[in-house]
Amino acid sequence: MESVARVGPLGVRFWDFAEERFVADGLIVRVGLASGGSRITATAGESGIFTARGLPGLNVIEFGDTAAGYWSTTTTKSYVVEVHDPAGRFLPFSFPARLPARGLFVWTCALSPPSSGLSDGVPLFSAPSRPAASMRGVIRAQLQDAATGGDAAGAVLVATIAGSATVTGIADARGRVAIVMPYPEPSDFPIIGSSPPVVPVGSSLAAYSWPVTLAAQYGRITPYPPYPDLCTTLRQPGATLLGDASGSPLPTQTLRMGVELVVRSVDVATGSALPVLLVRAP
């Protein structure tokens, strides 16, 4: 018996590193052919999965005999998915997709090094305007191109905390970057994850700190688009973060509980902190 059904060409969900959960509320997701043309707005169900139907170029393909080798005979096409958060929690971005895709969309542009806590979904990256929630660590920087003096738009900042947990942030069009993440759990403080945190007698949350090693990827994406391709951004070449304008490497930083870490290069002449963190492209 022929089984004709309407096939959803795209099902995708988005992962928030900071809250360690999938996010759908407030996101605007649009899908269209990579060659251009109109965009279809995807909708999210109760499961948090965004689906898009009626995509240009797939109207006929969406209806097929799903019991007769549909997926083995269907030809895919190149699409672009654009993601925007009007609330300003996450950076806008885009990513390519071959559609229709069977099952949940698999994002193939892996982070390098892999970020801690990445789940099955397309990652969201915090915008600098995002307010930090309780019990979340924040690392901020204003990234400046050491050669041109311009904003290092789209530069990737990778933080390795206490030699183990790795988290990633991306600079916006003005070079501003914020990494928002759960604090690492101190080995001698196993109940930090409780809500509210339970503090042992004689202990203080504010006393905890972690060493942070920072690295960058930066290849001067120009002109910087409204919806930067996430795969292209994360595949930028390794760059050098400078401790000062003379070219000294950036030293290890310290993240303290309850205090945002703002990373800056140093003025060689005065020894005072500059308003920016210098990054040198390869």
Where are these regions (language model features)?
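Long, positively charged binding patches that form subdomain-scale interaction surfaces
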Residues: 130-213
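Short, ordered, surface-exposed loop/turn motifs in non-cytosolic proteins
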Residues: 19-35, 148-162
